[in-house]
Design a protein with these regions (language model features):
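Sequence/fold signature of self-assembling virion shell proteins
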Residues: 215-349
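Ordered core of a single globular domain
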Residues: 180-238
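N-terminal alpha-helical "arm" segments
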Residues: 1-42, 336-349
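Short acidic (Asp/Glu) and glycine-rich catalytic loops that position anionic groups and cofactors
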Residues: 160-162, 306
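A surface/extracellular/periplasmic glyco- and lipid-processing/surface-interacting theme
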Residues: 163, 167-178
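Assembly/oligomerization interface modules of large self-assembling protein complexes
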Residues: 31-100
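Long, contiguous amphipathic alpha-helices that act as assembly "spine/axial" helices in icosahedral shell
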Residues: 82-158, 175, 179-180, 185-206, ...
């Protein structure tokens, strides 16, 4: 009976539907900070090359051109992408089957299946949003006993790129302008490009409005006693940042529900992240090939083509004892940082 009810639902349709599910618009980390990329394998690989090119030397006319030296250093890291996913059993199945036997069609069952397919996709993307936040926070992606899996990927981010504010920004007498200027100097010293934007919480951004250094900069005060004490408006804070050529601030306050009923923030509320431009050269969220996708690309009538194998895969099936219909979402994926020293993740309070 189950086979007859589900015979019109193909693996091809389910996967196409799953991959058409839109990512949450607020998921900036996997959306544009470390964007998603599909790779044809199960291993991530990063390659960093640094080349030192010395200045040329003048020579006398008719003298031999000197032979220059060069210094090239290449660091290559690879590892296995970890699997993730989940399985749903269709709820209230007995009620649905009884309704079908009374002459109704299987549309309710089909609708529930596709609802679960969408939920699998969103769940996997939510976990990867948390993973990117984990990597950005301390330079490491860490799993500790998650379904028996323990993994640590260390991107080797220098400690200078993970500073702490000289004085917590919750103190109105702190100097966030001086802090950010120092962090920009750290980036310049390593040859990093100017950050495109700052990613932080509303709470951290709001601290600038009541900060003495920002007020003094806005009003052009030399003596603190002459500085108005009014809280700055957002556009006034932006004016100060523009004056010092500081990158624009983007608010990121995403919270993701966990299966224990709590909410998790991908990024701690106290982090101030300076994000570089050209981010596909900095880091990505890599999706590889799952065992399920390999199975779907084989046989006389494959459900998907080989080039479609990387990414999120959702499969479905049924059994008679006990009577169950299930869907399963799968992926092998994690964030990978290619260049560890062109961003700043600062703790500001």
């Amino acid at each position: 009976m189950l086979e007859a009810l589900l015979r019109d639902i193909t693996a091809t349709e389910i996967i196409a539907f799953a991959r058409a599910v839109q990512t949450e618009a607020s998921y900036a980390l996997t959306g544009n900070v470390m964007p998603e990329r599909q790779i044809n394998g199960v291993k991530y690989k990063t390659r960093r090359t640094s080349r030192r090119v010395n200045a040329a030397k003048y020579r006398a006319y008719d003298a031999q051109t000197p032979i220059a030296s060069r210094e090239v250093k290449q660091i290559e890291t690879e590892g296995q992408l970890p699997p993730l996913g989940q399985k749903y059993l269709v709820g209230e199945l007995e009620t649905i089957l009884l309704a079908v036997r009374r002459g109704q069609d299987a549309s309710e069952l089909v609708e529930m299946l596709f609802d679960d397919v969408a939920a699998h996709t969103k769940s996997i993307r939510s976990r990867l949003e948390l993973a990117v936040g984990d990597l950005l926070t301390d330079g490491k992606f860490t799993l500790t006993g998650e379904n028996g899996l323990t993994v640590e990927y260390d991107a080797q981010v220098p400690s200078a790129n993970m500073p702490t504010a000289a004085t917590p920004w919750t103190d109105p007498t702190s100097d966030p302008i001086a802090d950010e200027m120092a962090w920009l100097e750290t980036l310049r010293a390593s040859g990093a490009p100017m950050p495109e934007k700052v990613l932080t919480s509303y709470q951290a951004r709001a601290l600038l409005s009541g900060n003495d250094a920002y007020r003094a900069a806005y009003y052009g005060s030399v003596n603190p006693s002459n500085t108005p004490t009014a809280t700055l408006a957002p556009n006034e804070v932006d004016a100060v940042r523009a004056r010092y050529n500081l990158p624009p601030v983007e608010i990121y306050d995403v919270q993701i529900p966990k299966d224990d009923g709590t909410m998790a923030r991908p990024l701690p509320v106290d982090r101030w992240i300076m994000v570089p431009p050209n981010r596909t050269q900095w880091g990505e969220t890599q999706y590889g090939i799952t065992a399920e996708s390999i199975a779907l690309t084989t046989g006389d009538n494959p459900a998907i083509e080989l080039e479609e194998a990387p990414g999120i895969i959702v499969t479905h099936g049924w059994q008679d004892d006990p009577v169950q219909v299930w869907t399963k979402g799968s992926a092998v994926a994690m964030p990978v940082l290619y260049v560890p020293d062109i961003h700043i993740t600062a703790k500001v309070f």
